[in-house]
Amino acid sequence: MWIRLGLVTGLAALVAASSSAGAQVLSEKNISIKMALVIAETALTECTPRVSVAVLDRAGRLRVFLQGDGASPHNLELARRKAYTALTFRRTSADWAKRTAEGDLTGQRSLADVIPLGGGVPIMIGEEAIGSIGLSGAPGGQSQEEACAKAGIAKVQDQLK
């Protein structure tokens, strides 16, 4: 009986020690409000005053939203969803739209808050998405929105390390 109790106690101590050894605090990079503002303002300036710009943090929370003069009301939601799509899949929303147009990946289009439209770009440090930007309402369409989003990110590229 004492042997069994000793074995059980020893095994419990071993499990507890191995569990706590693997537990540690995570260190994650995220987009700051200052960086989000610079990206959004640059994208708006590069594009047209009629666009809406949404910048999200790594968790998909809205950090900055700019609605240009004369922007349509629905562009707010479109910009946010484009940014969310880019963040979630760590690729431009236009690239994701192409990848999910046919085949096994089409089911991804039914996920909440994603949208198969161009204009969303992830903000990356290496392979890690720390945020994203989405634009909607550019007169040149989705390719212009993506170019403006990339210009916003380029403004802070030296800080993305």
What role is predicted for each listed range?
Residues A21-K161:
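Flexible, solvent-exposed loop/hinge segments and secondary-structure transition points
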Residues M1-I3:
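N-terminal secretory signal peptides that target proteins for export/translocation
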Residues G6-S18:
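Bacterial N-terminal signal peptides
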